[in-house]
Amino acid sequence: MIHRAPLHLLYLNVLVIATCGLIYELLAGTLASYLLGDSVTQFSLIIGVYLSALGFGAWLSQYVTTKLARVFIEVELALALLGGFSTPLLFLAFPMIEWFQWLLFGSVIVIGTLVGLELPLLMRILKEHLEFEELISRVLAFDYLGALFASLLFPIFLVPRLGLNRTAIVFGLLNALVGLWGTYLLRPLLAKKGLDGLRGRAFLVIGLLIAGFIKADSITSLAEENTLGGRIVYADTSPYQRIAVTRNEKGFQLYLNGHLQFNSVDEYRYHEALVHPVMSVCKDARRVLVLGGGDGLAVREILRYDHVESVTLVDLDPAMTRLATQFEPLAELNGRSLERDRVTVVHRDAFLWVGEGDEQFDAVVIDFPDPGNYSIGKLYSSRFYNLLRERMTEDAGLAIQCTSPLVAPKSYWCILRTMQASGFDVTPYHAPVPTFGIWGFALARIAEDPESDSDWRLPPELSAKVAGLRYLTPSTMAGLFDLPADQQPRDVPPNRLNDQILVRFYDEEWGQNQ
């Protein structure tokens, strides 16, 4: 017989196991998005498979006819081990196993099945002590409350503070503690024989998870080094992304969510090609806007022009600009550009920021990550470009990176078509960057009328006001605008906010080249 006080403690168990269950689901979805890309597809698949596994676990519970309390505790301990170590082990397995997705979804099915077993078993344990209506209402209320806790804790505290690996281990520990606690709360329902062994296994699982928590940083570094192919020298997890910097004998590399952003060996080619064409067109630009580019490297190039009075950099993630100022190798590489008096840093979603203000700029440089998901894809939409157009002066120019026109031609030309549909005259150009291959850019200005100034479409002459470039020369600048036959325009529709075809193009084209 379970007394009234332990009954209330069992409700707390419901709250804990519900929170743990949703956290495991969120971890799987986040991990899949981080490693495989396309967050909408990955989360949709994870949620669907996980919910199906919950149902399968609930169905299986009918075949547990005896020793309910013992089976419940065994399930908690199994879930503690599998759920707690699932994320670290999947991180380690990713670069080594070709059939990683099968392993990922297999773990989701097993964890979901175990979670699906928990509540039916606990409800059957409680049914002898509560009326049916009271049992259902209380258990489900605590179950949904646990889901609320999980959904709030995960993005606000757990991922930014603990990271994915430690979050998984912490909730594995909670499951193990529920199991250990159950050996005392449910003592009247447990046979004395084997009880010490059950508690011993619970302590063993807790010990393993504590050891895993202590070594979580080492596990994370090993997994990322295997995935990224270099020694991790800096890592940070923000509410928006995972930031990692690797180093090899040639230099250091920045990765965001596992995707390479630049290599210090040849980043100057990319950033000179991004910045100097538009600054050569906007010869006397005084106010310059940089969207993205929190590494400070594009700003470094803009500050070469003495006539620039102010640079406003808008980057969503403070962790990125903190890296640019506090990680000494990057601070040296960007010339401490973000610390200059002429530079103002704004931490804001660029989509919202562009739509809220009215200050206008003489030149705009856009250095967003590639449109690999819908949250970034909105920054390449016609709606965004329409808003941005209102923040540009009449003679302003705009430069944007547009992924590779060779590897992803539909993605590249979709970006340009979107800008044209938003009222810009657009000129394509490209540059060879050894780390990335052929990389695409676009130079644009507001179209005044269908018969736009033809001089705009001519290759701009490299400004005589800039010095110290390592890549661009007057003849090199002209060559950027000479597209070969295999990079000619494609007939693709524009990218709209409510139909982000660009993200699908990008996933399709880059997925084929992985």
Curated annotation (Swiss-Prot):
Membrane topology, record value: Multi-pass membrane protein
EC number: 2.5.1.16
Residues where S-methyl-5'-thioadenosine binds: 241, 315, 349-350
Annotated PABS domain residues: 211-446
Region: Spermidine synthase, residue numbers: 198-453
Active site as annotated: 367 (proton acceptor)
Coiled coil: none
Keywords for this protein: Cell membrane, Membrane, Polyamine biosynthesis, Spermidine biosynthesis, Transferase, Transmembrane, Transmembrane helix
Residues that bind spermidine: 271, 295
Pfam families attached to this UniProt entry: Spermine_synth (PF01564)
Keyword match Membrane: yes
Function: Catalyzes the irreversible transfer of a propylamine group from the amino donor S-adenosylmethioninamine (decarboxy-AdoMet) to putrescine (1,4-diaminobutane) to yield spermidine.
Quaternary state and interactors: Homodimer or homotetramer.
Similarity field: Belongs to the spermidine/spermine synthase family.
Protein name (Swiss-Prot/TrEMBL): Polyamine aminopropyltransferase
Organism: Rhodopirellula baltica (strain DSM 10527 / NCIMB 13988 / SH1)
Top-level taxonomy: Bacteria, Pseudomonadati, Planctomycetota, Planctomycetia, Pirellulales
GN (gene name): speE
